Design a protein with these regions (language model features):
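Chalcogenol-based redox active-site neighborhoods
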Residues: 11-12
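Extracytoplasmic/lumenal domain signature
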Residues: 15-26, 32, 39-94, 126-165, ...
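Structural signature of eukaryotic scaffold interfaces centered on beta-propeller domains
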Residues: 98-107, 170-178, 234-245, 315-317, ...
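Anion-binding catalytic surfaces of enzymes that hydrolyze or transfer phosphate/sulfate esters
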Residues: 111-115, 305
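Membrane-proximal interfacial segments on either side of biological membranes
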Residues: 204, 244-254
Length: 392
């Protein structure tokens, strides 16, 4: 349940109505039917299911009770309380979340599928899900033939902020220590571009932050805590594009701070109190960033373009050293891939919040984009698909 026209809100399920329930709460059986997320493979000819990978395992879901992210950033967790309640919530994995809603990447040579997973459930509130909540908020590598887990990289153990792995992973070769390594990159909601060895899942490096960061991984409070990026900030569902010519990965992102406030519906009759975390947009400037991240130099940002609205579409890099992206105000932009100079702009009449694509037909290269707007962000809506032809 999304509450708030900005798309920043909270999800809350209640078994029955009660005084004090906030607007947007789901009442009834929906509160009892949560399910773990999964990826599944089907035979294209027969439709038969071949395998299924569940995002939350029955064994080991609690993990190691990590106090840091894999790259060493501290997490504000109550480990003692989590361990004390582990026995009480041993079955939490059954409704543990980890929704799979992003497009995977495939390496046919390694026989691996790389996919992102969503945040744990209950969303934001962590009292009933002690542990790291594996394999939520993770980039996972699955055997393409069997669906077995080869490795995982959990970007945020025990997520309390909505930092699901939303942007699709991208494959490229990275240069590290004079060596060329087959890599997979993932642009995160936390504001970093992670680059991993796609054979082992080992972290090669993370980029410089491509959006402002404030109170990252701090625990939400009853007084309210402003955190940036928020649940819809950083790189959300926007696909990344990589150019072999420039060695740069191009990331579209959003600066959208959010206030996280812990609230409680009082106990009523025989019903216990219900705690939840409300998310509210912070008053103040919000903007988008298009960042060119150098994967040959450890993730330095070579250039960055700022847009007046958060970027929630995607990026297209071409062999002609152009980078295309769309804005919420309706502009489709073309930048110089190496310098970031804005070279061309076309107003599409509605928010350009889908990734551009390119193809060649009868010797002519086309760039095509959908301009449909975005109701969640309040961008002007439309129903156009617009094609541009590049000169021969």
């Amino acid at each position: 349940v999304i509450v708030g026209i900005t798309g920043v809100g909270y999800g809350l399920h209640l078994e029955s109505d009660r005084p004090g329930a906030p607007l947007g709460a789901v009442i009834g059986i929906a509160g009892q039917s949560q399910r773990a997320g999964f990826y599944a493979a089907f035979d294209a000819a027969s439709g038969r299911r071949l395998w299924q990978f569940d995002s939350t395992p029955s064994e080991g879901w609690e993990g190691e009770f990590r106090t840091t992210t894999p790259d060493g950033a501290p997490l504000e967790r109550d480990i003692a309380r989590e361990k004390a309640t582990l026995g009480q919530y041993r079955q939490a994995w059954k409704s543990g979340g980890g929704s799979a809603w992003t497009t995977p990447a495939v390496d046919p040579d390694l026989g691996l599928i790389f996919a992102g997973t969503g945040n744990p459930s209950p969303q934001m509130d962590d009292l009933t899900r002690p542990g790291d909540n594996l394999y939520t908020v993770s980039l996972v590598a699955l055997d393409a033939e069997t669906g077995k887990l080869r490795w995982h990289f959990q970007e945020v153990p025990h997520d309390m902020w909505g930092y699901d792995v939303a942007s699709p992973p991208v494959l490229f070769d990275a240069r590290v220590g004079g060596r060329t390594i087959p890599a997979v990159g993932q642009a995160s909601k936390t504001g970093w571009f992670y680059v991993l060895d796609r054979r082992s899942g080992g972290l090669l490096f993370k980029s410089e932050a491509f959006v402002p960061q404030q109170n990252l991984f701090r625990r939400p409070t009853a007084e309210g805590l402003e955190i940036a990026p928020g649940a819809v900030g950083g790189a959300s569902w926007s696909p990344v594009s990589y150019s072999e010519r420039s060695g740069l990965a191009y990331v579209a992102a959003a600066h959208l701070p959010v206030r996280y406030t812990v609230r409680e519906i009082p106990a009523h009759g025989e019903e216990s109190a219900v705690r939840y975390t409300a998310l509210e947009p912070v008053e103040g400037p919000k903007w988008g960033t298009l960042s060119a991240i150098d994967v040959r130099s450890g993730g330095k940002i070579r250039w960055q373009a700022k847009t007046p609205e958060p970027l929630v579409g995607g990026v297209l890099a071409t062999a002609g050293d152009l980078v295309f992206t769309g804005e919420g105000n309706g502009n489709l932009d073309a930048f110089d891939a190496r310098t970031g100079e804005l070279l061309w702009q076309f107003h599409c009449g509605a928010g350009v919040n889908a990734p551009p694509v390119t193809f060649e037909l009868d010797g002519t290269q086309y760039v095509v984009v959908a301009a449909g707007g975005n109701a969640i962000f309040g961008y002007r809506q439309g129903e156009a698909v617009i094609a541009f032809a590049l000169p021969r």
